Amino acid sequence: EGSGGSGSSGNFTTGSNVRMSSVTNTSNTGTGTSGGGNSAAASGARHNAPPVSVTLTESLLNK
């Protein structure tokens, strides 16, 4: 039970971080001036993409 609880907490934390990243990406896109920055952010997002997809789905289900 303890490990299960930890897993849930971890997922929630990841969801918060993902949301922050999304907001940051939106800001960068709106600026449009930081082209290189967007590229770097994109590569970082790709690595986080697989777990993020699951987290986003879980977040929607929780809501």
Swiss-Prot record:
Subcellular compartments: Nucleus; Cytoplasm, Perinuclear region
Keyword set includes Nuclease: no
Record key words, sorted: Biological rhythms, Cytoplasm, Nucleus, Phosphoprotein, Repeat
Compositional bias (Low complexity): 9-31
Gene Ontology cellular component list: nucleus; perinuclear region of cytoplasm
The record's account of how the chain is modified after translation: Phosphorylated with a circadian rhythmicity, probably by the double-time protein (dbt). Phosphorylation could be implicated in the stability of per monomer and in the formation of heterodimer per-tim.
Composition bias, Polar residues: 54-63
Region (Disordered): 1-63
BP GO annotations: rhythmic process
Subunit composition and interactions: Forms a heterodimer with timeless (TIM); the complex then translocates into the nucleus.
Function according to Swiss-Prot or TrEMBL: Essential for biological clock functions. Determines the period length of circadian and ultradian rhythms; an increase in PER dosage leads to shortened circadian rhythms and a decrease leads to lengthened circadian rhythms. Essential for the circadian rhythmicity of locomotor activity, eclosion behavior, and for the rhythmic component of the male courtship song that originates in the thoracic nervous system. The biological cycle depends on the rhythmic formation and nuclear localization of the TIM-PER complex. Light induces the degradation of TIM, which promotes elimination of PER.
The protein's name: Period circadian protein
Organism of this sequence: Drosophila mediostriata (Fruit fly)
Gene: per
